[in-house]
């Protein structure tokens, strides 16, 4: 089921199969462009029409009332609520370490310079709905926004055909202290919050994963609002040596593959016998999985095993893929960590499975995909703040440096820039 590649002999074939890029087909572009245009022109009417078309329900109100949120929280399994609270506390605690402070300093000659860090005013957090509920996505998006100090936070998630939002998502919203929840999804939800409608406020940033239409809509509205990233299918790379446990690896690969047939799971190992053991574990465990068809399709079309001569080569292959998740099932994971350059999150050792990061540990699970870990980072407090430079020159400081500054502007051929300095020098 999982094709085996030998590196470096089959490097080109491996790259062709596994190197992924964010791309969208022409039909998706056409559909999303039409949705964005109609929502921008027609506001609520277009959003309600698209919700009826895609979600199968004609809403009379797009917002979830607070009573429904309270009821979902009260009726939820108490042990789940306790876990949600503990997980959220872990996520908040991690993101508190990311908080940046404004700074000022006195430069040469008494010039005052600084940078002010301020939270964005409004954020929309998109939480996927449909076949599965993702309260973890709500917690992961809410925590950095809250820690950053965003004033108004709205969540939107698709309701079902009866107009009801998954109660576990509502309970998670209560845990995160969010009461502004909308029950719309898809590109129409992205458009509504990017442009604003009669009943939906325009926001400053949209974050959170979704299907290809949500991802493309976020890409298209960037510039009207900020976005976190453009999410593609989920992916994991596992580097393993002969000390690894085959069932651990097989189930960790399944954990990615069960998301989506387009998800990718790749094992890179120095041991051919271990690769064979994982193949056997996959064959044995697959029939026991509830989503065995999705897993099988994902592994068949987007999975692989890569046999490498050394762990240094394993690191090179991983960096070529720049995966969303990277697990290190090796004797000394900390020894190879410095050799790895590109990954959204790295899980150290056989007992640090990716599931822990998805739900509980604290670092954000909203991660760069499709090779974008080469230049993008996990969702963080930094996504929800903006930076403003502060510059203060006194008359004396301008008198000292003004001629130099004006000459610099002259060198660029920008007369008005230069004269804006010289006119001030004439008053000194």
Curated annotation (Swiss-Prot):
Concerning Gene3D superfamilies, the annotation shows: 1.20.5.1300, Nitrogenase molybdenum iron protein domain (3.40.50.1980)
Instruction: Name its GO BP terms in alphabetical order.
Output: L-histidine biosynthetic process
Q: Which GO terms describe its molecular function?
A: histidinol dehydrogenase activity; NAD binding; zinc ion binding
Binding residue positions for Zn(2+): 256, 259, 358, 417
Q: Where, by residue number, does substrate bind?
A: 234, 256, 259, 325, 358, 412, 417
Q: Can the keyword Kinase be found in this entry's annotation? A: no
For the protein in the UniProt heading, the enzyme class is oxidoreductase
Q: Which InterPro entries match?
A: Ald_DH/histidinol_DH (IPR016161), Histidinol_DH_CS (IPR001692), Histidinol_DH_monofunct (IPR022695), Hstdl_DH (IPR012131)
What is the reaction catalyzed? L-histidinol + 2 NAD(+) + H2O = L-histidine + 2 NADH + 3 H(+)
Q: Which Pfam families match?
A: Histidinol_dh
Q: Which residues bind NAD(+)?
A: 126, 188, 211
Q: Which UniProt keywords apply?
A: Amino-acid biosynthesis, Histidine biosynthesis, Metal-binding, NAD, Oxidoreductase, Zinc
Name the pathway. Answer: Amino-acid biosynthesis; L-histidine biosynthesis; L-histidine from 5-phospho-alpha-D-ribose 1-diphosphate: step 9/9
The EC number of this protein is 1.1.1.23
Please give the cofactor(s) recorded in the UniProt entry for this protein. Zn(2+)
Name any GO cellular component annotation.
cytosol
Cite the active-site annotation: 324 (proton acceptor), 325 (proton acceptor)
Q: Which NCBIfam families match?
A: hisD
Main role?
A: Catalyzes the sequential NAD-dependent oxidations of L-histidinol to L-histidinaldehyde and then to L-histidine.
| UniProt-recorded name of the protein | Histidinol dehydrogenase
The source organism is Chlorobium chlorochromatii (strain CaD3)
């Amino acid at each position: 089921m999982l094709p085996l590649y030998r590196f470096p002999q089959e490097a080109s074939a491996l790259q062709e199969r596994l190197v992924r890029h964010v791309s969208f087909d022409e039909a998706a572009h056409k559909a999303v462009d039409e949705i964005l245009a109609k929502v921008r022109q027609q506001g609520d009417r277009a959003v309600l029409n698209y919700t009826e078309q895609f979600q199968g329900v004609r809403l009379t109100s797009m917002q979830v009332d607070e009573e429904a949120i309270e009821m979902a929280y009260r009726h939820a399994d108490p042990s789940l609520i306790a876990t949600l609270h503990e997980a959220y506390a872990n996520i908040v605690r991690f993101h508190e370490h990311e908080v940046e402070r404004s700074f000022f300093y006195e430069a040469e000659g008494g010039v005052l310079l600084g940078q002010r860090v301020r939270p964005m005013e409004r954020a929309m957090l998109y939480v996927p709905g449909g076949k599965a509920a993702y309260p973890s996505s709500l917690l992961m998006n809410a925590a950095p926004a809250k820690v950053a100090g965003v004033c108004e936070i709205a969540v939107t998630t698709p309701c079902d055909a009866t107009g009801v939002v998954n109660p576990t998502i509502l309970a998670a919203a209560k845990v995160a202290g969010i009461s502004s929840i909308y029950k719309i999804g898809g590109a129409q939800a992205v458009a509504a919050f990017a442009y604003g409608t009669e009943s939906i406020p325009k926001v400053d940033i949209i974050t959170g994963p979704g299907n290809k239409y949500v991802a493309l809509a976020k890409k298209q509205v960037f510039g009207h609002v900020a976005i976190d990233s453009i999410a593609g299918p989920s992916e994991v790379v596992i580097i393993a040596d002969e000390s690894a446990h085959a069932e651990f690896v097989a189930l960790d690969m399944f954990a990615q593959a069960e998301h989506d047939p387009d998800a990718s799971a790749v094992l890179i190992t120095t041991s051919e016998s271990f690769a064979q053991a994982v193949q056997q574990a996959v064959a044995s465990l697959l029939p026991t999985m509830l989503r065995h068809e999705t897993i099988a399709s994902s592994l068949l079309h987007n999975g692989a095993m890569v046999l490498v001569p050394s762990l240094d080569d394993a690191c090179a292959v991983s960096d070529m893929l720049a995966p969303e998740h990277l697990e290190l099932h090796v004797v000394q994971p900390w020894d190879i960590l410095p050799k790895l350059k590109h990954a959204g999150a790295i899980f150290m050792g056989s007992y640090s499975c990716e599931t822990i990061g998805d739900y509980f540990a604290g670092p954000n699970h909203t991660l760069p995909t499709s090779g974008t870990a080469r230049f993008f980072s996990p969702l963080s407090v930094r996504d929800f703040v903006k930076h403003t430079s502060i510059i203060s020159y006194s008359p004396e400081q301008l008198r000292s440096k003004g001629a130099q500054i004006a000459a610099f502007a002259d060198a660029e051929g920008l007369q008005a820039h230069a004269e804006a300095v010289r006119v001030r020098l004439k008053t000194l």
